[in-house]
């Protein structure tokens, strides 16, 4: 029997406008509580952004944020993986040697805030505000006093995959993954949604066969591999569709919540 349901956000749980039906979710969460089913949101977004999206029900949801770098439930951090200061500073120096990297299109997410350089591309900054809360400008990354979870950086549609490959080949200790929207997330090399959901299942004393996950993109790949019941919307990447036990309708038609209601 399914005891934990986790879903990606963009391209999966959210519709094309980046929205969902809150009243429908409230009814679902009430039903899940009676059935003893946990609900988790697993996203590359930061915790502050997720809590804002789900403000009305945030105490009833498990948040797997920052592409698996942080798991929070009832205000407690069940799992976290942050980059030491020297590590993220040296990682930045290495990234600057990439022919695909543009520091004006880079954001770091931390526990207290998100950070961009004060030379940030303003179009990129506007884009980033859609997915991140409390973005602060700094003159140098050395000015940051926060704990850092990940880098996010944008490429062009033509260079995002080769840029991701460059990071994975040339920058030690990190893992880059495409998140959609021509961007990649760069996290510690042992971090992803799959690792986080395995750790969460352990905390909840669940077997992975009791876990269902919905995802559409490559940052969902490991999560879809480790859960007992991977489900993908029809708009998912081919690599995700191949892993799926079940393929459902397009995310724009709220297919994920409809499927969840049938459990």
Residue ranges of each PLM-predicted region?
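Asp-based phosphoryl-transfer active-site loop
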Residues: 3-18
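Short, structured coil segments at secondary-structure junctions
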Residues: 57-59, 67, 170-172, 226-227, ...
